[in-house]
Regions:
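Short beta-edge strand/loop motif at the mouth of beta-sheet-based domains
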Residues: 44-53
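A beta-strand edge to alpha-helix "cap/lid" segment located at domain peripheries
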Residues: 2-7, 38, 52-122
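Conserved beta-to-alpha transition
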Residues: 40-42
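Short, low-complexity N-terminal intrinsically disordered segments enriched in polar/charged residues
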Residues: 1-29, 33
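Phosphate-binding glycine-rich loops and adjacent basic patches that engage nucleotide phosphates
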Residues: 11-20, 44-45, 61-65
């Protein structure tokens, strides 16, 4: 736990630690039962079962390390910028920048997450 951040922000930092550790059960517990997750290239994932399916079967990343470079807290929301370095399921190595936006429910669980990647698109 980091004393510089709120419990919600520490929960976001825990999220990246759990993802990097491959702790899918721990990841899912951070989300509200009806949470929605949106990221480029996929239809939104709604609910814990859909999130678990994504992390177990659909996520193109095999493993890696997230480094959070900045974290900004708002009212019931947390924004993060960071870098990811890892390996895709194909064996390809990747290194990219990302931004995540988490909406936090009154109970502390994530009600929504939106992910964006810094990649040439236009």
């Amino acid at each position: 736990m980091n004393d510089r951040h709120s419990p919600a922000a520490n929960r976001v930092l825990d999220y990246y630690r759990l993802v990097d550790a491959g702790d899918i059960a721990g990841i899912i517990e951070l989300f509200a039962p009806d949470a929605e997750y949106s990221r480029p290239g996929y239809d939104p994932f709604v609910g814990r079962a859909a999130l678990e399916t994504f992390y177990r079967n659909q996520r193109t990343i095999r493993g890696g390390k997230h480094t959070v470079r900045s974290l900004v807290e708002g009212v019931d929301a947390i924004a993060v910028q960071g870098e990811f370095t890892g390996t895709l399921r194909t064996g390809e190595r990747v290194s990219l920048r990302f931004a995540d936006f988490f909406d936090v429910a009154p109970d502390g669980n994530f009600s929504r997450r939106n992910t964006y990647f810094y990649q040439p698109m236009v």
